C-alpha cells in the first residue's frame, strides 16, 4: 500500500526503496485517496491527469461507441496472464539457471513478451503520419432529400456517429504539431447505409492536378533522401525546386505560407473536401458539390515565432489542446457546408470544376450550412483507434458519387493500396475502428488477420446451395443498392491535361488580394523564411519569378528579404486575369470577417505571494462566466497565500506553462515586488506582447509596463486599472474575442523575446 506522511496525508512516498522490495507485481500501489482515478465529469485543462474516453465520459454513447464496447479491455481486478491466458507468477525476472546463471530459452513468458514488443510498431502513414483523433456525431439541420438520397442527410432527427482525424502532412509520427504545413481533416461517417469518408484538408485545393505527380510531389516535400533532413518542414531545396518548376503548386503553396499553415488549434481550423463530388437524389438528378467544415469556435492561427517555439516547448500542442478541450466539455463543433453547382452550370466559370488546384470562390457560390458535427469523446487507445483508422475517399454511400477530377481518381486507388501495406492485408475493414455500424455481407474471404468467421458454405455467386445469399439490392430511392451516376463518357485514350487546367496564377492572386494587410505581411514572412533555408540561389530566384507572375508587390517584398533584384521583364509582367471578374473574396481571409467567441480559451494569471484576493476572485468569476479557463502560475510549484489568508494551489510555473500555450495574460494586484525581478515572469509578459496577446495589469502590476517598454497610457491590447472590476474584465474579454492585437504589429520587431 502507499505510505502516507503522518503530518500531511496528501504527501505520498515511494513504496519501493531497495532490491528486497523489487517484486511489486502482487501489491496495490495506488494512493489510498483514489487520486489516481479521473473524475467522470468535465475538468479544466491540466486540472487532472488525462484519461481514456470511456473513463472520462462513460455516458457519452452512440451506435459506434457501443459497438466498440465489445472489444474494449479493462485490466482492473484481473490477473496478469500471457497472451494464451496462463497466469503469470513472476513478471520481474527471466528464467535462469541459478540467480546469476544464463537465461533459459524455454522461458516462454520472456519470449512472448519480447517478441510482441519487437513487433508492436506498424509502418506509419506515408503522409499524414502525425495525427490526432476524436469521436463525435453529425446531425443535419434539415432534410436534404431534394439534392441527395443519402440517408444520413435525409432527416434532421438522424444522428450519425463520426470519427475525425486531424494531421500534418510532411513530418513523421513523432514530429511536432505546430510546424508550417497543410493539415489533414478526415471524417468517417458511420451511416446506416455504410461508411462515408470525407478525406480532406484545411485548404480547399491541393498542390497537384493529376495523381500521377503525387509520388513526385511527396518525394520533393519529404526529408531529402541523402540525409533525411528536414523533419516536419518544407523549408528545403527539393520542395522549392519542385514548386519553382511546377506552377500548378502555387495556389496551395500560398495557403501554406499564410496563417492557414499554422492554425491555433484544430478547433479553430476550417476543413475542405478539396475535390468536386456529386450529390444524387432519388430521381437520379446530379448536383456538383464541394464540401466545407466551418468551425463554430471561429478561425484563428498562431504567429510564426510562436509556432516555432512551440515545436520545442510543447511539440504535442494541438494534440493536447484537442484532448483537453474535449475533457473540459469545450467540444469542437463544425458546420458542414455545401457549395452546390447545378450540372448545367458546369462550364459557367473561367476555371474547371474538376481542377483540384482551383477553388470555387464563396462570393460566387455561397456555402450553405446544412448540419453540425460535434466531437465529444476522446479515444480509449491511441494505437487501436487513431493509428489503425483507415480513411478512404472511395468510401461513399448511395446519394454520393465521384467526378472525373484526375487527382481524386488516383486517390481512389492509392488509399486501398496503402492501407493494405500499412495494416497488413485486405481485412483492415475488420479492425474495430473501421467496421461499419450496419451489417456487411459479401464473398470476400480469408487473407491476413481475418476476424469474422463466415458460415456461408458458398463463397461465390450465383449459388444455389445457400439460396444465392447474400443477394444484390436493386437501386432505389431509399436503402437501395449503390448505383453509379450514369455520366456519358467518350474520348480517345491520351496522356494530356485539359487546356482548362492551364491557368496557374489567377487563383493565387485572388487569395493574396483577399488577405488583410497583416496577413499579407505574414505571407511575405512565410516565403522569406522558407526560401532563406534554400541553399541553391537559382531555386530562390525561380520561386521569386513565379511570385512575380502572381503579384508584383508580393514578389518585390520577398525578393527584398532575399537580396534579389527583380529584372525589368519581371517588373513589367502583366497581372493574371481576375477569377470570374472577382478581385477579392473575404472568406479566403482568416480575419477579414470576425467570428467565434472566447469559450474554451485559456488565460494565464501570474500570481504573487499576498495577491489581492478580491481582485483574483473577480477575475476568476468573470472568466468562468464566459467559459474561459484560468491557469494560476507562479515561480515555483506548490501554493501561494493571498492577502486574506486564502491558500491558492499553483497549476504550473511561469516556465512550465509558457505564454505560447495561452491566449491572454493577467497580472492581478498584490505584492508585485515578489515577482518583479523574476526573469521568467518578465519574459512571460514580453513574449506575450510580442505574440500580440492581450495583457491585463491591475493595480501595482502596472509596473510591468516598463518590462515591455510601454510608456503610453491606453495602448490597445493593454488593459490597466486600479482593480479588476467589471469594465477591466469586459475590455480584456473583448480583446480576446479578436484573437490577437493586430494593431501592435509595427512595434513587435523591437521586442527581443
Curated annotation (Swiss-Prot):
Disulphide bond pairs: none
Gene Ontology MF annotations: catalase activity; heme binding; identical protein binding; iron ion binding
Cofactor section: heme
Keywords: Cytoplasm, Heme, Hydrogen peroxide, Iron, Metal-binding, Oxidoreductase, Peroxidase
UniProt keyword Transmembrane, yes or no: no
Keyword Metal-binding: yes
Pfam families (UniProt xref): Catalase (PF00199), Catalase-rel (PF06628), Catalase_C (PF18011)
Region annotation Disordered: where it falls in the sequence: 1-61, 459-493
GO biological process, one term: response to oxidative stress
Family the entry assigns: Belongs to the catalase family. HPII subfamily.
Role noted for this protein: Decomposes hydrogen peroxide into water and oxygen; serves to protect cells from the toxic effects of hydrogen peroxide.
The protein's name: Catalase HPII
Annotated organism of origin: Escherichia coli (strain K12)
Amino acid at each position: 500500500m502507499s505510505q502516507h506522511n503522518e503530518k500531511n496525508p496528501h504527501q505520498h512516498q515511494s513504496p519501493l526503496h531497495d532490491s528486497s522490495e523489487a517484486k511489486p507485481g502482487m501489491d496495490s500501489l495506488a494512493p489510498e485517496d483514489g487520486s489516481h482515478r479521473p473524475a467522470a465529469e468535465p475538468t479544466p485543462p491540466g486540472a487532472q491527469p488525462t484519461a481514456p474516453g470511456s473513463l472520462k465520459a462513460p455516458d457519452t454513447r452512440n451506435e459506434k461507441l457501443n459497438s466498440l464496447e465489445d472489444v474494449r479491455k479493462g485490466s482492473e481486478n484481473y490477473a496478469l496472464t500471457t497472451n494464451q491466458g496462463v497466469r503469470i507468477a513472476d513478471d520481474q525476472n527471466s528464467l535462469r539457471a541459478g540467480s546469476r546463471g544464463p537465461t533459459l530459452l524455454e522461458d516462454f513468458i520472456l519470449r512472448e513478451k519480447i517478441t510482441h514488443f519487437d513487433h508492436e510498431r506498424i509502418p506509419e502513414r506515408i503522409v499524414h503520419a502525425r495525427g490526432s483523433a476524436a469521436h463525435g456525431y453529425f446531425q443535419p439541420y434539415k432534410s436534404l432529400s431534394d439534392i441527395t438520397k443519402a440517408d444520413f442527410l435525409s432527416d434532421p432527427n438522424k444522428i450519425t456517429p463520426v470519427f475525425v482525424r486531424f494531421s500534418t502532412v510532411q513530418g513523421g509520427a513523432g514530429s511536432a504539431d505546430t510546424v508550417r504545413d497543410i493539415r489533414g481533416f478526415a471524417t468517417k461517417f458511420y451511416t446506416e447505409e455504410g461508411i462515408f469518408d470525407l478525406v480532406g484538408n484545411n485548404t480547399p485545393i491541393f498542390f497537384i492536378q493529376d495523381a500521377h505527380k503525387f509520388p513526385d510531389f511527396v518525394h520533393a516535400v519529404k526529408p531529402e533522401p541523402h540525409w533525411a533532413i528536414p523533419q516536419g518542414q518544407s523549408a528545403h531545396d527539393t520542395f522549392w525546386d519542385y514548386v519553382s518548376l511546377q506552377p500548378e503548386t502555387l495556389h496551395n503553396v500560398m495557403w501554406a505560407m499564410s496563417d492557414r499553415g499554422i492554425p491555433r488549434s484544430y478547433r479553430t481550423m476550417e476543413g475542405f473536401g478539396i475535390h468536386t463530388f456529386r450529390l444524387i437524389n432519388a430521381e437520379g438528378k446530379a448536383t456538383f458539390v464541394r464540401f466545407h467544415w466551418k468551425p463554430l469556435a471561429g478561425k484563428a492561427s498562431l504567429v510564426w515565432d510562436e509556432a516555432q517555439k512551440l515545436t520545442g516547448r510543447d511539440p504535442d500542442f494541438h494534440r493536447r489542446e484537442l484532448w483537453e478541450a474535449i475533457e473540459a466539455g469545450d467540444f469542437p463543433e463544425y458546420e458542414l457546408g455545401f457549395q452546390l453547382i447545378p450540372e448545367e452550370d458546369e462550364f459557367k466559370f473561367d476555371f474547371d470544376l474538376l481542377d483540384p488546384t482551383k477553388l470555387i470562390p464563396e462570393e460566387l457560390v455561397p456555402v450553405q450550412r446544412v448540419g453540425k458535427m460535434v466531437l465529444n469523446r476522446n479515444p480509449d487507445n491511441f494505437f487501436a483507434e487513431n493509428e489503425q483508422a483507415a480513411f478512404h475517399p472511395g468510401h461513399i454511400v448511395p446519394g454520393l458519387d465521384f467526378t472525373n477530377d484526375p487527382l481524386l481518381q488516383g486517390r481512389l486507388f492509392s488509399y486501398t493500396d496503402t492501407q493494405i501495406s500499412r495494416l497488413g492485408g485486405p481485412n483492415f475493414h475488420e479492425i474495430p475502428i473501421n467496421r461499419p455500424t450496419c451489417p456487411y455481407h459479401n464473398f470476400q474471404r480469408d487473407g491476413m488477420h481475418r476476424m469474422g468467421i463466415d458460415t456461408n458454405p458458398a463463397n461465390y455467386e450465383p449459388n444455389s446451395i445457400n439460396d444465392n445469399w447474400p443477394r444484390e439490392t436493386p437501386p432505389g430511392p431509399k436503402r437501395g443498392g449503390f448505383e453509379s451516376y450514369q455520366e456519358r463518357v467518350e474520348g480517345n485514350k491520351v496522356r494530356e491535361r485539359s487546356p482548362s487546367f492551364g491557368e496557374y496564377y489567377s487563383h493565387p492572386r485572388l487569395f493574396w488580394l483577399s488577405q488583410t494587410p497583416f496577413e499579407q505581411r505574414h505571407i511575405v514572412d512565410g516565403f522569406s523564411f522558407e526560401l532563406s533555408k534554400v541553399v541553391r540561389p537559382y531555386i530562390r530566384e525561380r520561386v521569386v519569378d513565379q511570385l512575380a507572375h502572381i503579384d508584383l508587390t508580393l514578389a518585390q517584398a520577398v525578393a527584398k528579404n532575399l537580396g534579389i533584384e527583380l529584372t525589368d521583364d519581371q517588373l513589367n509582367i502583366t497581372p493574371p486575369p481576375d477569377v470570374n471578374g472577382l478581385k477579392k473574396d473575404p472568406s479566403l481571409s482568416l480575419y477579414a470577417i470576425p467570428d467565434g467567441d472566447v469559450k474554451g480559451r485559456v488565460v494565464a494569471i501570474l500570481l504573487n505571494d499576498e495577491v489581492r484576493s478580491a481582485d483574483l476572485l473577480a477575475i476568476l468569476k468573470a472568466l468562468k462566466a464566459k467559459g474561459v479557463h484560468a491557469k494560476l502560475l507562479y515561480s515555483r510549484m506548490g501554493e501561494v497565500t493571498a492577502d486574506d489568508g486564502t491558500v491558492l494551489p499553483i497549476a504550473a510555473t511561469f516556465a512550465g506553462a509558457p505564454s505560447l500555450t495561452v491566449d491572454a495574460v493577467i497580472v492581478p494586484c498584490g505584492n508585485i515586488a515578489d515577482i518583479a525581478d523574476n526573469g521568467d515572469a518578465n519574459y512571460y509578459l514580453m513574449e506575450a506582447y510580442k505574440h500580440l496577446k492581450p495583457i491585463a495589469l491591475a493595480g501595482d502590476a502596472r509596473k510591468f509596463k516598463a518590462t515591455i517598454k510601454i510608456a503610453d497610457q491606453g495602448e490597445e491590447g493593454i488593459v490597466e486599472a486600479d482593480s479588476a472590476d467589471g469594465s477591466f474584465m469586459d475590455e480584456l474579454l473583448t480583446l480576446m474575442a479578436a484573437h490577437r492585437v493586430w494593431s501592435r504589429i509595427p512595434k513587435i520587431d523591437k521586442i527581443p523575446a
